[in-house]
Amino acid sequence: MSFNINWDSIQKESLSAWTAELLNDALNSGKRPNVLCTDIQIEDLSFGTIPPDFEILEIGDLSSDSFRGIFKFNYDGDASITLRTKVQANPLKIYEDNLLDQFEDDQRELGEFIKPRFVMATDILEIPLNLKLSQIKLSSIIIIVFSRSKGLTLVFKNDPLESISVSSTFDRIKPLARFLQNKIETQISELFKEFLPSVLYKFSQKYTTENFADFHRELLHTQHPERNTENRVTLQDIDPEAPLIISPGSLMRLTTLSSSRQTLTLGGKISADKLNPDIITKNYFNELIPKTYNKFQLKADKVADIAQNIHSIKNLQSRIFWKNSKNNDKPHRRVVCLGDKDKSKEKCKQVESESLYRRSVYSQGSIFNDGASDVSTLTESTEVEQEAPNTEFPKLQAVDLKPDMSVETIIQNSSQEKHRKVKPIDDIGLIGRRKERLRELLKYDVVDFSMPPMPGSPTKFFNTNIFHDSNHINNGNLPIRVAPPPYQC
């Protein structure tokens, strides 16, 4: 398991200044070496742009107040640090100082007696030194142990330093450059092994539970030195064992006390609620309701596509059902037929169009019948508005009438026309069905021409020519039966 470090967050001047101050105190602590004439100062500190890599190898202990883990640490970045100091260039002066350091304080007089007394040879000769450390490559396995009561402990299991680049003002002098390279590598190895863990341990003591009250008082005194912080009550004074944990009852009392001194606040969040985010107050629901609003807007075409939505819902329900189903039972579904009304409407429209076509007139004329025969004749009449007939249906031919024709001649011609051979089989069947339908309709309507036609009567579509024949006159009425427009045959 590994994790990434947000390296950009540490590229701040405040952190760089704090780290430089911490390193200055660390480098100048203890007795200064005789080769140095002044303290070491950090001129420039850069963390670079490449973060280190941490890999978790083992988590031994993980609780609310303690942690123990083993990590693998690797770094090969572009961090750099520039140091400035002054070194002693007189070797006799360095020898004399090192000779005196071999004797203890009570033997100082003996050291002054045995050292050589050089007059001008032991004078101080200072040379400024600028030292830059870059191209640092580290790799090690570290153990981190943290406790609220004891602080942070860091241990390197091996030497973390693999390589480092040292550049100084003595690079042209090869012996001095090699000496500085070896000396700095040795010092940095000791720095990671001994000095760095002790610095981190002392620094972590300021932020643990034991020293939290002192740190809080120092912080208040730094921000407000004029205030008297001796009478201030802290969380450490209320509950020394667990200063950062407050019971719900105590928090409710603090909330009531805090709200009693707040006036003219409309729905504002009480300051005491920040101590425990798990508590539910009257303002909790005011913050929760806006979070339940649906912020995802759907397009109109997605909502209108009912079939696609139902298909998506069906797939989702099927996945949930089969995921939670322990047996092989099939899901029970309610079947909803879509588009049945539309299909029925289309069927009705088709039937109406067929009936409308049957009512269309293929030829113009009136129908005469002598009452004794089922054969009918046609006379010329005015045109009637009609829809264009389909080419699939045959067009019936009307019988040509002459003024000197009698009814018998018309009937005879009609009989011959009736027995005329028709080649298409479909035409014969269609004409036969139309004649059967005509016979059924001719059984009813008997038209009296002495009376005006009734509204809606089929005779209003025709201008009938009446043949005056004494043989077919029955009490002044002609036995005429008129068929509706679709059956003018």
Curated annotation (Swiss-Prot):
Q: Quick one: which gene encodes this?
A: MDM34
The organism's place on the tree of life at top rank: Eukaryota
Its primary localisation, in coarse terms, equals: mitochondrion
The UniProt keyword set, sorted, is: Lipid transport, Lipid-binding, Membrane, Mitochondrion, Mitochondrion outer membrane, Transmembrane, Transmembrane beta strand, Transport
The terms under GO molecular function for this entry are: lipid binding
What is stated as this protein's family in its record?
Belongs to the MDM34 family.
* Alphabetical list of PANTHER family matching this protein: MITOCHONDRIAL DISTRIBUTION AND MORPHOLOGY PROTEIN 34
What is the name of this protein? Answer: Mitochondrial distribution and morphology protein 34
Query: In this protein, which residues make up the domain named SMP-LTD?
Result: 1-205
What cellular-component terms does GO give this entry?
ERMES complex
Q: Name one GO biological process term.
A: phospholipid transport
Cross-referenced HAMAP family, in alphabetical order? Mdm34
Q: How does it assemble?
A: Component of the ER-mitochondria encounter structure (ERMES) or MDM complex, composed of MMM1, MDM10, MDM12 and MDM34.
Q: How does the record comment on the protein's domains? A: Lacks alpha-helical transmembrane segments, suggesting that it resides in the membrane via beta-sheet conformations similar to those predicted for other outer membrane proteins and porin. The SMP-LTD domain is a barrel-like domain that can bind various types of glycerophospholipids in its interior and mediate their transfer between two adjacent bilayers.
Reported function:
Component of the ERMES/MDM complex, which serves as a molecular tether to connect the endoplasmic reticulum (ER) and mitochondria. Components of this complex are involved in the control of mitochondrial shape and protein biogenesis, and function in nonvesicular lipid trafficking between the ER and mitochondria. MDM34 is required for the interaction of the ER-resident membrane protein MMM1 and the outer mitochondrial membrane-resident beta-barrel protein MDM10.
Write down the membrane topology. Multi-pass membrane protein
Localization, UniProt:
Mitochondrion outer membrane
